[in-house]
């Protein structure tokens, strides 16, 4: 039984870590509330294939599990288009030193 029925999740990236997040979160949230941003075709979750498609959904929580070099692009897009979202970014945060700061959303690195 899903506990958080009205919350929506975006998982950016569906490699091994993205899959783990999707499997764990699908035990808490309804699968229909989980969207995966990936180029892969996935039958068990809703997918979007381009970052700009993210505008169509309004996620409460965002997990960034893409390759490290792509984290900055995702964070900048989210920061530009959303407020008050909770973001989990897989470590390391960036592949090279960066002074970008998330100000409109809450960002955690793990």
Which residues does each PLM region occupy?
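Rossmann-fold NAD(P) dinucleotide-binding segment
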Residues: 69-90
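N-terminal glycine-rich "phosphate-gripper" loop used for MgATP/nucleotide binding
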Residues: 59, 64-71, 92-94
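Structural motif
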Residues: 8, 60-61, 86
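A contiguous active-site-proximal alpha/beta segment in oxidoreductase catalytic domains
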Residues: 93-110
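N-terminal Rossmann-like dinucleotide-binding module
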Residues: 1-45, 57
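A short helix->loop->beta-strand "cap" motif at the edges of active sites that frequently abuts
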Residues: 30-32, 82-86, 105-106
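Short amphipathic alpha-helix with an adjacent loop that forms part of the alpha/beta core around
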Residues: 48-58, 101
């Amino acid at each position: 039984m899903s506990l958080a029925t009205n919350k929506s999740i975006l998982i950016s990236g569906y490699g091994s870590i993205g899959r783990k997040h999707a499997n764990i979160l699908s035990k808490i949230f309804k699968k229909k509330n989980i969207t995966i941003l990936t180029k892969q075709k996935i039958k068990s979750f809703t997918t979007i294939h381009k970052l700009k498609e993210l505008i169509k959904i309004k996620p409460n929580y965002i997990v960034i599990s893409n390759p490290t070099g792509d984290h900055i692009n995702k964070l900048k897009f989210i920061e530009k288009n959303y407020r008050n979202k909770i973001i989990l970014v897989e470590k390391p945060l960036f592949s090279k030193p960066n002074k970008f700061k998330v100000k409109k959303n809450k960002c955690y690195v793990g």
